[in-house]
Structure formats: C-alpha cells, structure tokens
Amino acid sequence: MTLILGLESSCDETAAALVTGDRRVLAHRVAGQEAEHRPYGGVVPEIAARAHVDRLAPIVEGVLDDAGVTLADVDAIAATAGPGLIGGVMVGLVTGKALAHAANKPLIAVNHLEGHALSPRLADPTLDFPYLLLLVSGGHCQLLLVKGVGDYRRLATTIDDAAGEAFDKTAKLLGLGYPGGPAVERIAAEGDPHAVPLPRPLVGSAEPHFSFAGLKSAVARAAASGTHDVADLAASFQQAVVDCLVDRSRGALAACPDARAFVVAGGVAANGAIRTALTDLAARFDKPFVAPPLWLCTDNGAMIAWAGAERFAAGLTDPLDTAARPRWPLDPAAEAVRGAGVKA
C-alpha cells in the first residue's frame, strides 16, 4: 500500500503526517505558533518562517517514530509548494526536496488549496467527483467545482478579503485575542446575532463573488462607537458572514445541478454556526453535505499527504527544481476578479 509523507508550512502551523493510499493516517503532528504571534495580533511572516526552521525536522522525525517506519518505507514526499507566506513555504518545500533526494523518493509539490479541496475525501471514502466546494480560510474564500485531481473550475472568489481574515480582524477590534476565529465563535455564543445591524456585501446580487471588506469596516465603526455589547457584536458579525456564505453558495448550487455533494473545507469550516447553516442549505438542494472533522479543517500535514497520495496515484510527481509559489490558483484559467487574484 502506498505511503506518503506530507509536509505543511505555508502559514503558522508546522505539520507533518504519514498517510496511506487507503486513507489510513498512520501518524500526524502539528505545532502551532499562537504564543509567538499573539503579541502582534496576527501572523508575522518572518517569525513564522523561523519557527518552521526550528520545528519541521523534529516533527518529521516524530511522525516517522510514531508510525514505526523509516524514510525507506515511504513511497513519496509531498510538500506544500504554495500558495502562502513564501518564507514558510520555502522551508517546507526545501525540506521535502532534501528528504526526497536523500532517500531517492519522488517529490510531489502540493498546492495548499488542493490539500484543503481533497481533504474531505480523506475523511469520507464515499465522496466522489464532481462536487461543489466552498473553500473558506484565512487567506481564501472560493467556490469551486472539483471535477477531479488537479481539475478545478472556480465559480466565485473574494473581491477583497477572505472570511477568515475578517474573523481575525474582528477579534482584534474586539480585543478577543489570537487566533481570531475560535475567539469570535466562543463569545458569539453568548450574544444576539440580530442585535447589531451589519451589511451583507453582495448578498442578493447577480455577481457570484464574495466581499468582506465592507463588513470589516462596519464592525470597526460599531466597535469604535462603544455602544454595543462585545458578545452581541461578535454574534452579529458571525451571522453576517454566515448569511454571505449561504447566499453565494445557494447560487453556486443552483448553477451546478450535477455536483454529487456540497462540501466545505478550510480553517473557517471549523466554525459551528457556518457548518450548521451549510448543512441546512445542502438539504434544501437535496445534496449530501460533507465537512472534514475539525482537525482536518485547519492546516495540517495529513491533507498534504492525502493530496500527495491522490496525485501519486494519478502518476503526478514533480522535479526537484520545482519553485515555491506565493500565489498559485487552483483554476489558472479563471479570470482575475478585481483584487481577488492577489492571494489565490
């Protein structure tokens, strides 16, 4: 059975995992960097890259020990090659290249977004192509028709900020700390989601894309006014994001009747309110709803190893001179949408 070692270092998680072609996660480890970045209220790229340098090799050794295997037992090395913070991406990719060269194993350069896009198939063996994917994370917010490994059609993207970035900014504005997404979700549970009137950018419009910059600005003004309870403001913000995601996804579901399932992935997919709303939306379209377990939503090595396993099975490997890419769209044929191509 195929065994893939996956490495992930595109943002602020240093991770490695060993995954088999029949979906067994033999070992996985993730080292977060919350303590390093919390004083700054967000990820500092240079600090993140240096942390990856310090942590990746011990984590790789750890997963090999956990699984009771050596590099000789591995069939290929999969490493995130982009998109992401270029310093961190380079740490993981160079490590992957070195391991592949030293062990004489194939290298698989994985698009971080493809790692998220295929992660639901690691958790659910019944999920077949094609499926409609809402990919929602700190740096990306896209609707994609996933037609196969390496075959994606982008239906919508954000014209400005990603939903996850809006969560982090809101947490900072409200003094909730870092990481922002879980902090906002926790306090939102104590508030009234209808207490503060906030905009839902592009909701109801014919345009298929997302926008969160105006919502962020509205939260900033509401927070500065000092007239709103923090829990109410957090809950109202979260509900606005839910409404935006549901509205845009509704249009995509209507446009993709042949999609076999509606799938969500990415770090923001760990949010309970979002998962509940999307579950209800899928039911209205009579589609199965698939979401990875929470540990597979945030950045991890298992999703990179699984994407590597899927690509390896398709005969897709990469040369050792493959370059790291800070930007790498899953659908290179998709037209740029205002500022949307910056992060995708």
Curated annotation (Swiss-Prot):
Indicate where this protein resides in the cell. Answer: Cytoplasm
Concerning InterPro entries, the annotation shows: ATPase_NBD (IPR043129), Gcp-like_dom (IPR000905), KAE1/TsaD (IPR017861), TsaD (IPR022450)
Gene3D superfamilies assigned to the protein according to its UniProt record, in alphabetical order = 3.30.420.40
Query: What cofactor does this one take?
Result: Fe(2+)
Q: What is its EC number?
A: 2.3.1.234
Q: Which residues bind substrate?
A: 135-139, 168, 181, 271
Enumerate the Gene Ontology biological process terms. tRNA threonylcarbamoyladenosine modification
Pfam families, sorted: TsaD (PF00814)
- Listed name of the protein: tRNA N6-adenosine threonylcarbamoyltransferase
Q: Which organism is it from?
A: Sphingopyxis alaskensis (strain DSM 13593 / LMG 18877 / RB2256)
Originating gene: tsaD
